[in-house]
UniProtKB/Swiss-Prot annotation:
Protein name: Small ribosomal subunit protein uS4
GO MF, any single term: structural constituent of ribosome
GO BP term (any one): translation
Subunit text: Part of the 30S ribosomal subunit. Contacts protein S5. The interaction surface between S4 and S5 is involved in control of translational fidelity.
């Protein structure tokens, strides 16, 4: 499965919520896309409900199938609750944290900033979006990238978004991944237990 690059509104309408960021389309057309979207009321099987939840998580965090399965496998081998481990690992991705800090306006934009080497971790450029941050890691905008309009615009409009597991210093454009978030701190509407049940089949 290739990375989805189509309209975000179409994905939001499929799940009935702004999975890939704010979507004005949901306000006008809060039903599934397609010719029969408005009248789609078939009873869903347990499997389809579980699969849909996994797809929602993949679209939310911008992760492809193979990488998602690998992340789940790692989460299952860790101590603790598998579903919560999965979400914590998705939250600890570099691209997601760049988005959470407000450096980028969306996870898709954050991914591009990472790929194009605008982000540093502990002083070194890291261009791997899936890079797993560890508690104590410092990350921020590369010195020569601090004047990029997309970054400054995003920081000016999203700086109010604060997450307890992150720290951010606006003047230096440097942040810190303090710790892994607790489940109740993660705002995404994902029922991770359904994903665990799907992989347990």
């Amino acid at each position: 499965m290739a990375r989805y690059t189509g309209p975000r509104s179409r994905i939001s309408r499929r799940f009935g919520e702004p999975v890939m960021g704010d979507s004005k389309a949901l306000q006008k057309k809060n039903y599934a896309p397609g010719m029969h979207g408005r009248n789609k009321k078939r009873k869903q099987s347990e499997y389809s409900i579980q699969l849909k939840e996994k797809q929602k998580a993949k679209y939310t965090y911008g992760v492809l199938e193979r990488q998602f399965a690998k992340t789940f496998d790692t989460a299952a081998r860790k101590q603790g609750i598998t579903g919560e481990n999965l979400l914590k690992m998705l939250e600890a991705r570099l691209d997601n944290t760049v988005y959470r800090l407000g450096i980028a306006s969306s996870r898709r934009a954050a991914r591009q900033l990472v790929i194009h080497k605008h982000i540093v971790v502990n002083g070194d450029v890291v261009n791997i979006p899936s890079y797993q941050l560890k508690p104590g890691d410092q990350l921020g905008v590369r010195e020569k990238s601090k004047s990029i309009e997309a970054i400054t615009d995003s920081l000016s409009t999203q700086s109010a978004k604060k997450f307890t597991w992150l720290e951010w210093d606006q003047s230096s454009m440097l942040g810190k991944f303090v710790t892994y978030p607790q489940r109740e701190e993660i705002p995404e509407n994902i029922q991770e237990q359904l994903i665990v049940e799907l992989y347990s089949k």
